[in-house]
Amino acid sequence: MQPRLIKKGAEADIYFTTWAGRKAISKIRAPKPYRHVELDRTIRKQRTIREANFMSIAKKAGIESPYVYFVDPKNAEIIMEFIEGRNVKDVITPALCREIGRYSALLHSINIVHGDLTTSNFIIDKKRLVLLDFGLSYYSERTEDVATDLRLIKEVLASAHIRVRGAFERFVEGYVSIAGKKKTDRILENVREIEQRGRYARVT
């Protein structure tokens, strides 16, 4: 079938397509005209390879993510499993908040920071929670980097999902179940420090 554009993003374009007779998603990093041609080609190639690797590593760690069917570094394209289901941002519940916390801790346990940890990047497929979009992910052992993931999801849960009572608390419960209380408390302290810096910057 002819690929159909379903989302045009700042970093990549997303197409609905098929692969070996199965529904699939094609993610293509389009060239950036403001970058030097060779530099742009190198950046898109490296980011494509890195994202595909992160998806595979996350899956091995027990995090549901789309299967990678094909990677074309030259054309900066990843063809992956199409996940049928509903976006978590539309069906959020306390139980899903807890599961998102568990997934986040699993990801951080293998030193991967997601980089865009929002409810928009989770899909619930029947009873399977799937984490999407590793395009901004990176390796880090720094507590402050991990805290940026928690800071973002905390902000999202407090603003977009205010109707879910105790959403971030349920997230933390899930996180503690994997990371343990001591490590989680240390990360949350970093989250508070980031928040304080943000408030100070707005005041000054």
Model-predicted segments: where are they?
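Conserved kinase catalytic-core helix
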Residues: 55-63, 87-120, 125, 129, ...
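Conserved hydrophobic "DFG−1" position in protein kinase catalytic cores
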Residues: 16-19, 28, 70, 82, ...
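Conserved structural core of kinase catalytic domains
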Residues: 30, 34, 44-48, 52, ...
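Short glycine/proline- and charge-enriched loop/turn segments
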Residues: 32-39, 86, 133-135, 150
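Short hydrophobic-acidic sequence motifs that mark active-site Asp/Glu residues
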Residues: 16, 23-27, 79, 131-133, ...
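C-lobe/activation-segment region of protein kinase-like
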Residues: 130-204
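ATP-binding glycine-rich loop module of kinase domains
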Residues: 2-49
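Short strand-connecting beta-turns/loops that link adjacent beta-strands
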Residues: 19-22, 73-75, 126-127
